[in-house]
């Protein structure tokens, strides 16, 4: 054997071993650093969606980071210079505060205040980096080629200062305002939430739904039927709302009169009488008596008003309105200029001692209020109503709608621009553009920005007691106002900054809000660069960024806020392309969560599964479709792509080393198989590039799976004799050259997805660079593509696969020759020589449809025939048993009819099926429109030839175990039993030729290796012939 040019994969080496070896190589040779510095002719701007490192990275994070890495590696290999190839860390907000509260055992905001904001925030600051080392370790193991040396961190003063600059800009352009209004509110966290936060926390729940009667003022026995799913709001009732255009009826029921929407009356009442009909606007202005007489209603309340939001789809068509606890209700109260009635504190408990439910959490009081209504004759009907209700997306508490002072960004005023900029974005999957994301833009609400919390970017607004407002846009402005800039811009230090109001001379104090943490991550495009205070970000060239990706919930989270801020600030979409990723479920298809105990942490799982195998699994199927974390699927996908490609390489390396082959460029292909594979290689490059460019990475995996399968199970199997030839001929060198090119090309195509094994193969094949990731993505040579040849060979492979499948079904091994194979369909005759090399058949024939050895069976299709034949159906069905199935088939072809017992039957009335005719002894299967028939009758001669092939296989295995070269000659001793003796007698020459055997000795001898073949056991010994 020649000196080894191509390293052999050590026996027992796993994919995990290879991945670890390459990771060490990258570290030892600073490969990532060289990737980061790689220049390019095209610009690609990356943006990392910042995680919070106060929790461990789970398996879903590993998938997201894999996809980011694929994009980075592919664009690096295709000549792009990657800008901003660094990570980011989200550091503020409720997620961090809640973990801190859990650590300290705090239950309310008061606990934090009593403990001390400074100490609490100090803990929060430290906690956000608790697992940062684990995150970076996972990034390294999974192969995420990101530069952590330049990570942006949202808690840094520079980041906060950039946000202040933008907030001041938004304020000065009239898009940031303060209002007292009803907002989504979490009573556990004691803070309001934005619409995009609320959108992430909806759950389907069953709440009590009640129909209650409000007595019309001044009437004897007349009531309004009002409906609500929040009985706890009834003590705060101020109005009843009707739709001005809906028809209402005054009905009589059980000696009482009721106003109700005409279309809903029959749902609420039975056996009622309609007294009068009117439109909703005719009810406006009517007064009614207070339902629950505990609180003092404000002047102007307790009357019927109109509102377009009322419908008659459900309920009664009359809505009870408590302006303190509903957005529409609040607007009604504001329109009617009536103060709100709010007996609920910020903890979500009734706080007015006059109420029987004082001190209770409002939602927990629902049932007690219903009992009160029933006992006092105020309840008409109650039931459970299933609807979607918002919960706090962080602490899982049901939200309230609650009146507060808050600062808002006027997103509604730029809604049209948001929609317009969305049209410039490429979405994957594309239905998000006008679906989940686009619909949210169409209804974009003003952004509730302020949070009455502690750990976050401080809202930079100062106010004096005369209500003069000053927005600060930089640290320098604080100095200009005569104050000292604290070293840390967070609370409580920023709260201590006070200055003189330039308008009135009074002291200005900061309003004690922090901002929505989503504004932090949504500012990453510019704040990460300390814009505009450092000259390293130019919106005209650095926006939009090229690509972002995160989980599906971020379409209404990070994706949304990026889009809003960029549109308002720069009048541009924030990103060109966005890929949304669905969830990794557990093996049973359940969503993972800590509470269920089925969470899988990335670092733990990567100790069990090779990173390349896991990465490949992540892209086995579209990433926007959920997939179960199934180890069997991971192993199967890895086997089909990675293991098979490694086996192909092993075959190449072993044989190339024997023959001293050295790749010096692709040789001119003369063999049909070489021409086909070279054509396939170039088609593979084109299709893979297209899939990568379209962000269809799962399609790259499918294409690679098909290519590796073609390479291993078709090209290599049909070409192996060329590699085993004794002499190093021109044909053999061409085969080596073609196989080398196929392995190298496949490695480069797979490099972004399977970075470790691809680099292992690249280095083993002596690629020209230190790493495959410093090389370029392969370019296709379209002149080498022969679509007709590919089509023919694809058909040949399809036939070969079908024959293999039939053999497996009828338990005839591939080494056992069969008498005949028949092919029927649109078959290219030129494939026959190729097919014959692999299917081990004495004869292959193409036959017409009529010549197929089939038996036709015919029966009635009862669903269509029975209604027509009626009482004759059984007699016709019996008569069909005596009719030739083929004749029936021919009769109904092309719209014809079959006459049976004076009935004319059409093809739609018949079930005509075919099975192989048992008289001929064939088994059948079909693929891609080609019928394949394998004759399963084996005669004596064919049977003996099959045994001879079994002997050859065992001798070849023994040669391999002895590490013999293919050129080494051997002597063989066989102790046969039964039919094996006849097989040796008849096929001795064949056995000797196939095994490089000089002498074949039959009979018992010492040191025989026992082999079980079928039901027999034979002994074989081989010995290398030493040249004299």
From Swiss-Prot:
Q: What does this protein do?
A: Catalyzes the attachment of isoleucine to tRNA(Ile). As IleRS can inadvertently accommodate and process structurally similar amino acids such as valine, to avoid such errors it has two additional distinct tRNA(Ile)-dependent editing activities. One activity is designated as 'pretransfer' editing and involves the hydrolysis of activated Val-AMP. The other activity is designated 'posttransfer' editing and involves deacylation of mischarged Val-tRNA(Ile).
Q: What is its EC number?
A: 6.1.1.5
Motif ('KMSKS' region) on chain: 591-595
Q: What does the entry's domain section say?
A: IleRS has two distinct active sites: one for aminoacylation and one for editing. The misactivated valine is translocated from the active site to the editing site, which sterically excludes the correctly activated isoleucine. The single editing site contains two valyl binding pockets, one specific for each substrate (Val-AMP or Val-tRNA(Ile)).
Q: What PROSITE patterns does the annotation carry?
A: AA_TRNA_LIGASE_I
By sequence similarity, the record places it as follows: Belongs to the class-I aminoacyl-tRNA synthetase family. IleS type 2 subfamily.
Record carries keyword 4Fe-4S: no
Kindly give the Gene3D superfamilies that the UniProt entry links to this protein.
HUPs (3.40.50.620), Isoleucyl-tRNA Synthetase, Domain 1 (1.10.730.10), Valyl/Leucyl/Isoleucyl-tRNA synthetase, editing domain (3.90.740.10)
Residues where ATP binds: 594
| One GO term describing the cellular component | cytoplasm
Q: Which GO terms describe its biological process?
A: isoleucyl-tRNA aminoacylation
UniProt-recorded Gene Ontology molecular function terms: aminoacyl-tRNA deacylase activity; ATP binding; isoleucine-tRNA ligase activity; tRNA binding; zinc ion binding
The coenzyme or cofactor needed here is: Zn(2+)
Q: Which Pfam families match?
A: Anticodon_1, DUF5915, tRNA-synt_1
Indicate where this protein resides in the cell: Cytoplasm
Q: What does the subunit comment say?
A: Monomer.
Catalysed reactions, as listed in the record: tRNA(Ile) + L-isoleucine + ATP = L-isoleucyl-tRNA(Ile) + AMP + diphosphate
PANTHER family named in the record: ISOLEUCINE--TRNA LIGASE, CYTOPLASMIC, SOLEUCYL-TRNA SYNTHETASE
Q: State the span of motif ('HIGH' region).
A: 51-61
Q: Which UniProt keywords apply?
A: Aminoacyl-tRNA synthetase, ATP-binding, Cytoplasm, Ligase, Metal-binding, Nucleotide-binding, Protein biosynthesis, Zinc
Q: Which protein are we looking at?
A: Isoleucine--tRNA ligase
């Amino acid at each position: 054997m020649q000196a080894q040019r191509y390293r052999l994969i050590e026996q027992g080496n796993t994919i995990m071993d290879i991945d670890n070896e390459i990771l060490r190589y990258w570290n030892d040779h600073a490969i990532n650093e060289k990737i980061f510095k790689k220049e390019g002719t095209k610009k690609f701007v990356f943006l990392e969606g910042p995680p919070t490192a106060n929790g461990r990275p789970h398996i879903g994070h590993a998938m997201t980071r894999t996809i980011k890495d694929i994009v980075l590696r592919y664009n690096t290999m295709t000549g792009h210079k990657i800008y901003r190839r660094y990570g980011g860390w989200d550091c503020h907000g409720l997620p961090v505060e809640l973990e801190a509260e859990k650590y300290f055992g705090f239950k309310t905001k008061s606990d934090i205040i009593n403990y001390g904001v400074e100490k609490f925030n100090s803990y929060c600051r430290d906690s956000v980096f608790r697992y940062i080392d684990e995150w970076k370790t996972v990034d390294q193991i999974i192969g995420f080629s990101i530069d952590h040396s330049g990570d942006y961190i949202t808690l840094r003063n520079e980041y906060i200062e950039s946000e202040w600059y933008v907030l001041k800009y938004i304020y000065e352009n009239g898009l940031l305002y303060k209002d007292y209004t009803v907002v989504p509110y979490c009573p556990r966290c004691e803070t309001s939430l934005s619409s995009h936060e609320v959108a992430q926390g909806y759950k389907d729940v069953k709440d009590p739904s009640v129909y209650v009667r409000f007595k019309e003022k001044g009437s004897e026995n007349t009531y309004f039927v009002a409906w609500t799913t929040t009985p706890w709001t009834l003590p705060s009732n101020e109005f009843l709302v009707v739709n001005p255009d809906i028809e209402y009826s005054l009905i009589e029921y059980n000696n009482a009169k009721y106003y109700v929407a005409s279309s809903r009356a029959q749902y609420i009442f039975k056996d009622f009488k309609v007294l009068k009909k009117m439109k909703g606007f005719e009810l406006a202005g009517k007064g009614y008596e207070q339902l629950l007489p505990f609180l003092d209603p404000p002047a102007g309340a307790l009357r019927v008003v109109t509102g377009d939001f009322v419908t008659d789809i459900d309920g009664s068509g009359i809505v009870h309105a408590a302006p303190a606890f509903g957005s529409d209700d609040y607007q009604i109260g504001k329109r009617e200029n009536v103060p709100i009635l709010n007996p609920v504190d910020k903890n979500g408990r009734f706080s007015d001692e006059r109420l029987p439910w004082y001190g209770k959490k409002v939602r927990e009081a629902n049932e007690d209020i219903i009992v009160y209504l029933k006992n006092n004759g105020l309840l008409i009907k109650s039931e459970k109503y299933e609807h979607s209700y918002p919960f706090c997306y962080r602490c899982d508490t049901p939200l309230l709608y609650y009146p507060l002072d808050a600062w808002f960004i006027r997103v509604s005023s730029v809604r049209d621009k948001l929609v317009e900029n969305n049209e410039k974005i490429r979405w994957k999957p594309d239905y998000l553009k006008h679906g989940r994301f686009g619909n949210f833009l169409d209804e974009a609400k003003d952004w509730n920005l302020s949070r009455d919390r502690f750990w976050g970017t401080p809202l930079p607004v100062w106010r004096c007691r005369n209500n003069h407002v000053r927005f600060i846009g930089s640290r320098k402005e604080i100095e200009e106002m005569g104050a000292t800039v604290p070293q840390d811009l967070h609370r409580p230090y920023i709260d201590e900054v006070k200055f003189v109001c330039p308008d009135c001379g009074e002291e200005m104090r900061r309003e004690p809000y922090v901002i929505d943490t989503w504004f932090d991550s949504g500012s990453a495009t510019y704040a990460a660069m300390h814009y505009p205070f450092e000259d390293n970000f130019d919106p005209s060239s650095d926006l939009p960024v090229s690509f972002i990706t995160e989980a599906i919930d971020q379409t209404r989270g990070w994706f949304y806020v990026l889009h809003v801020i960029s549109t308002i600030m720069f009048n541009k979409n924030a990103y060109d392309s966005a890929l949304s990723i669905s969830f990794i479920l557990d093996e049973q298809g359940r969503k993972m969560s800590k509470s269920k105990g089925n969470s899988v942490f990335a670092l733990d799982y990567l100790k069990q599964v090779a990173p390349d195998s896991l990465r490949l699994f992540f892209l086995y199927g579209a990433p926007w479709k959920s997939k179960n974390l199934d180890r069997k699927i991971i192993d199967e996908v890895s086997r089909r792509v990675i293991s098979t490609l490694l086996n192909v390489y092993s075959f190449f390396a072993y044989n190339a080393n024997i023959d001293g082959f050295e790749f010096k460029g692709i040789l001119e292909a003369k063999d049909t198989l070489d021409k086909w594979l070279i054509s396939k290689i170039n088609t593979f490059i084109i299709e893979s590039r297209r899939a990568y460019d379209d962000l269809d990475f799962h399609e790259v995996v499918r294409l690679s799976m098909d290519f590796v399968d073609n390479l291993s199970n078709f090209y290599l199997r049909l070409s192996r004799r060329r590699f085993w030839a004794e002499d190093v001929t021109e044909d053999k060198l061409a085969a080596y050259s073609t196989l080398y090119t196929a392995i190298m090309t496949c490695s480069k195509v797979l490099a972004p997805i399977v970075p470790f094994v691809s680099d292992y193969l690249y280095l083993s094949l002596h690629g020209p660079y230190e790493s495959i990731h410093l090389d370029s993505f392969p370019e296709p040579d379209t002149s080498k593509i022969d679509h007709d040849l590919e089509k023919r060979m694809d058909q040949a492979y399809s036939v070969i696969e079908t024959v293999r499948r039939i053999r497996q079904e009828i338990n005839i091994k591939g080494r056992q020759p069969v008498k005949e194979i028949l092919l029927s369909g649109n078959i290219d005759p030129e494939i026959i020589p190729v097919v014959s090399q692999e299917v081990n058949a004495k004869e292959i024939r193409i036959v017409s449809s009529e010549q197929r050895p089939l038996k036709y069976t015919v029966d009635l299709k009862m669903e269509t025939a029975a209604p027509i034949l009626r009482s004759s159906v059984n007699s016709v069905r019996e008569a069909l048993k005596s009719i030739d199935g083929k004749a029936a088939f021919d009769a109904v072809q092309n719209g014809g009819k079959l006459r049976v017992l004076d009935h004319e039957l059409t093809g739609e009335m018949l079930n005509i099926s075919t099975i192989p005719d048992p008289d001929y002894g064939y088994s059948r299967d079909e693929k891609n429109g080609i019928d394949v028939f394998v004759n399963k009758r084996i005669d004596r001669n064919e049977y003996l030839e099959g045994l001879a092939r079994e002997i050859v296989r065992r001798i070849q295995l023994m040669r391999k175990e002895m590490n013999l070269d293919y050129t080494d000659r051997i002597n063989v001793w066989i102790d046969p039993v039964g039919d094996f003796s006849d097989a040796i007698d008849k096929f001795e020459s064949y056995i000797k030729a196939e095994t490089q055997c000089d002498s074949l000795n039959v009979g018992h001898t010492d040191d025989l290796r026992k082999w079980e073949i079928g039901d027999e056991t034979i002994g074989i010994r081989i010995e290398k012939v030493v040249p004299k």
